[in-house]
Design a protein with these regions (language model features):
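Short glycine-rich phosphate-binding loop at a beta-alpha junction
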Residues: 62-75, 109, 224-227, 338-344, ...
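Gly/Ser/Thr-enriched, mixed-charge loops and adjacent short helices
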Residues: 12-23, 143-285
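N-terminal small/polar loop signature for handling phosphorylated ligands or for N-terminal nucleophile
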Residues: 71-141, 238-312
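An N-terminal, well-structured beta->alpha segment
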Residues: 2-97, 178, 183-222
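Phosphate-binding and adjacent anionic-ligand microenvironments
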Residues: 288-290, 314-317, 337-549, 553-557, ...
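Buried hydrophobic positions in well-ordered alpha/beta secondary-structure cores of metabolic enzymes
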Residues: 29, 72, 119, 131, ...
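Glycine-rich phosphate-binding loop plus the immediately following alpha-helix
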Residues: 153-181, 325-357, 415, 420-424
Length: 591
């Protein structure tokens, strides 16, 4: 978010504001910001503009019509539907969304506190738009919302026209007389607290039934599962579905304060807590098969496999976190996918296993890019299309038929489907969840990040090690003598000048000063620029440096032949004060 200055006339709302507005930015996961800056006015301006954009689209592209129902829901963050005294009294974001829906000529329908995929699925089935108020996995002091067309998520191509309408709406609303405006000088509704309409439960029921119907005839009987509830909006739904499908479920860890769970960045403290849950449940109930959970808005799964040794007749559990990119492989195999789309950050076990022939070109990171890739696969005639992200959020780009049951396409991240597919794959193959994952190619991943890392610095790091020629997507270094092969995003070889080759070699040499052989890295064999800088080493290590798309964070993704090595790469990356990422940042400053 960055401040805005707009010429104002005396008596206009903009002139009456007692703060400097920070406009929300369009991102691949919607619009997010610090709650202290999320005035109801700012939410309203953006939502009105996005609704106007949806109304401008033809029906076949997900357009909506004035007078239609428009669905909305929220997660369990305090600011989503209540004022938060700890965050400057901001909040009641859902109330601002509801008013924007009304003023855009739509009929708002509150589906309550349900998972993002539950809202999206319900709206798509009815050819209606939707908005989810959520900050997903980010800390509670941040929040936001995500708009869906009647077909699904907004995509990257929508960004420019949406932002143009936001600018127009901002100017129009700021220019209104302050005395007649809905908003006070603090950017909040003059009317104060507003109670939302009682939620309709039909969206929740439909989401539960979606999975009960698809897995009818199959049972999880005999599975003992821990459901880590924390503050996930889908915590009760998760327990309900698992129990209805026959599992014994032990709910644990329920929290009435918001707990940010980033399924792509489970730290040691979180993993230790979940292992404690496993040990306590095992001692009380006997051996458990897995711990399952989701992030805050329940569109990303979290799965911990549990295998047990028995010593003197007593179970000793061994719990292992299963990366979302590996969860996606098991899920797509179970569903019989003939096309799979993943971002470049995913574990490359996919490239080596049973789905390698179904693999479409890897995309940039973010569900809109995965969705665009799935649409390309559909255009090529593929009929069982799946996609997923490294965080485990799983998308279906086509209807999926299995055992004479049909699962309707849901082109947005979902946590419930991968959790269920992993469990049923385990049952069908007569293996524990851990044994099931042990059959995958032996490639191990880990991600970590530095928080409060200025985005401008992150972008400079990426730019420093990126060729100026924008067509270059891949650099291959097949020999140590200095040959370089250049490829574009379609994997077509590019001709290159001597200057291009020298620059590529300089980039490799520069990166080698940070990813040192003394730290276990081999010579650099390839660099990919699909999203950030992804570095491949001759010893099969992979290190990927990328700025977060929606926060001041710099991430490092690692893939290696052992989990220990993947963990070591991320530790080297985020170590303080002299890890690789900090060293890269310092190298930008003149000595």
């Amino acid at each position: 978010m960055e401040s805005t200055t707009i010429a104002t006339k005396p008596g206009a709302l903009r002139a009456a504001l007692n703060y400097e507005p920070l406009p929300l930015k369009f991102g691949t996961s919607g619009r997010r910001g610090d709650v202290v800056h999320l005035t109801q006015l700012e939410i309203y301006i953006n939502a009105v503009a996005e609704l106007e954009y949806l109304q401008s689209l033809p029906r076949e592209e997900g357009g909506i019509t004035r007078g239609d129902e428009f669905f909305y829901a929220s997660d369990l963050r305090p600011s989503s539907s209540h004022f938060d005294s700890h965050l400057g009294g901001r909040g009641e974001i859902a109330q601002a969304i509801e008013r924007a829906i009304i003023d855009a000529g739509m009929r708002p329908v509150n589906l309550g506190r349900i998972p993002t995929p539950a809202l999206t699925s319900y709206a798509i089935e009815r050819n209606r738009g939707s908005i989810m108020v959520t900050g997903s996995h980010i800390p509670f002091e941040r929040n936001g919302y995500k708009v869906n067309t009647a077909r699904g998520e907004l995509l990257k191509k929508d960004e420019v026209p949406v932002n143009r309408l936001v600018d127009e709406a901002r100017a129009r609303i700021y220019d209104q007389p302050a005395a007649k405006s809905l908003f006070n000088a603090s950017g909040m509704f003059k009317t104060g607290h507003h109670k939302l309409p009682d939620p309709k439960t039909s969206g929740r029921r439909a989401y539960v039934q979606r999975y009960i119907d698809f897995f009818t005839g199959h049972s999880l009987k005999g599975k003992r599962l821990i459901a880590y509830e924390h503050s996930a909006v889908g915590r009760d739904i998760l327990v309900e579905i698992l129990r209805k499908l026959g599992a014994e479920v032990i709910p644990t860890g329920r929290s009435e304060t918001f707990v940010p769970i980033d399924t792509e960045n489970i730290d040691d403290a979180q993993l230790a807590l979940m292992r404690q849950f496993v040990e306590k449940a095992t001692a009380k109930h006997g051996p458990v098969d897995a711990l399952v959970s989701t992030d805050g808005d329940s569109d990303r799964p979290l799965i911990i496999s549990v295998d047990n040794d028995f010593i003197d007749g007593q179970p000793r559990p061994h719990a292992r976190f299963l990366g979302g990119d590996l969860v996606g492989i098991i899920t797509a195999e179970y569903l019989g996918a003939d096309a799979v789309v993943v971002p470049i950050s995913c574990n490359d076990a996919l490239d080596l296993g049973s789905l390698k022939e179904a693999l479409e070109p890897k995309t940039r990171i973010g569900s809109p890019f995965v969705i665009a890739g799935m649409e390309k696969a559909r255009a090529k005639g593929r009929s069982r299309i799946c996609g997923w992200e490294a965080n485990g959020g799983f998308l279906t780009g086509s209807d999926i038929c299995r055992n004479q049951k049909t699962l309707k396409a849901l082109p947005t991240r979902d946590a419930m489907l991968p959790i269920l597919c992993v469990l049923f794959a385990s049952v069908e193959r007569g293996l524990s969840v851990g044994q099931l994952f042990a059959l995958l190619p032996k490639r191990y991943s880990k991600a970590a990040l530095l928080k409060n890392f200025p985005r401008a610095t992150s972008l400079k790091i990426v730019s420093r090690f990126t060729p100026e020629e924008t067509r270059i997507r891949d650099l291959f270094f097949p020999t140590p003598e200095g040959r370089v092969d250049f490829f574009n995003e379609d994997a077509r070889r590019l001709s290159a000048s001597d200057a291009d080759t020298r620059l590529a070699l300089n980039i490799r040499e520069g990166l080698s000063k940070f990813f040192r052989q003394s730290d276990g890295f081999g010579p650099i064999s390839r660099i990919n620029y699909t999203d950030g800088v992804r570095i491949y080493f001759a010893n099969n290590d992979v290190a990927h440096v990328r700025p977060s798309g929606n926060a001041d964070e710099l991430r490092i993704y690692a893939v290696a032949d052992t989990q220990e090595r993947a963990d070591a790469i991320t530790r080297l990356g985020v170590g303080e004060p002299d890890g690789i990422l900090r060293s890269l940042a310092r190298s930008l400053s003149p000595h």
